[in-house]
From Swiss-Prot:
Gene name, Swiss-Prot/TrEMBL: leuD
UniProt cross-references to CDD domains, sorted A to Z: IPMI_Swivel
Domain of life according to the entry: Bacteria
Reported function: Catalyzes the isomerization between 2-isopropylmalate and 3-isopropylmalate, via the formation of 2-isopropylmaleate.
The enzyme's E.C. designation: 4.2.1.33
Upper lineage: Bacteria, Pseudomonadati, Pseudomonadota, Gammaproteobacteria, Alteromonadales
Family: Belongs to the LeuD family. LeuD type 1 subfamily.
Protein name: 3-isopropylmalate dehydratase small subunit
Length: 201
């Protein structure tokens, strides 16, 4: 997966709490098991006025021209609640998002995001609201998320600190998913296997 060190990008917001995985990627789009092609269905029921997805909802933030190309999403508490579908971070990443900022995340969604190279950043309610206010007030507002420094810099230059488990930070900084992490120990694994009796190999 793509490493995440420091990213500056256009920010978009969804000013709602408890955004669940069925809203992120509705169940009718889960037939694929590969990670690509889900971005077009992201927030389908909010982005489109029709079931076919031919009529964009002009009121939904992700459809507004000022947010085109956004790569950082800001939302409210308990983002990613609901079912454990891994398609949710797949859809967010396929849409072009690199980081999600919220006061809290559902635990399974949080882990799935890290495992798929999408950085979930927890900030306080007050800090999240400040980011939303600044983004709303300034078209083209960009936010910087620095995983090395564990900071988020707002459009006005305010700096907020965040925490993440050391193992998760290491994996994201080095672009290591579960397979990549295993392959990092390829020499040790091969050495161990070479010492196994033939009947165990």
């Amino acid at each position: 997966m793509e490493a995440f060190t420091k990213h500056t990008g256009l920010a978009v917001m969804i000013d709602s709490a408890n955004v669940d995985t069925d809203q992120i990627i509705p169940k009718q789009f889960l037939s694929k098991v590969t990670r690509d092609g889900f971005g077009v269905h992201l927030f389908h029921d909010w982005r489109y006025l029709d079931d076919a997805g031919d009529e964009p909802n002009p009121e939904f933030t992700l459809n507004q021209s000022r947010y085109k190309g956004a790569s950082i999403l800001i939302s409210k508490e308990n983002f990613g609640c609901g079912s454990s579908r891994e398609h949710a971070p797949w859809a967010l990443a396929d849409f072009g998002l690199r980081a999600i900022i919220a006061p809290s995340f559902a635990d399974i969604f949080y882990g799935n995001s890290i495992n798929n190279g999408l950085l979930p950043v927890r900030l306080s309610d007050v800090e999240v609201q400040q980011l939303m206010d600044e983004v709303q007030a300034n078209e083209g507002a960009e936010i910087t998320v620095d995983l090395e420094g564990l900071t988020v810099t707002s459009p006005s230059g305010a700096v907020f600190s965040f925490e993440i488990a050391g193992s998760a930070r290491h994996n994201m900084l080095n672009g290591l998913d579960a397979i990549g992490l295993t392959l990092a120990y390829d020499v040790q694994i091969a050495s161990y296997e070479s010492q196994l009796p033939a009947w165990k190999a």
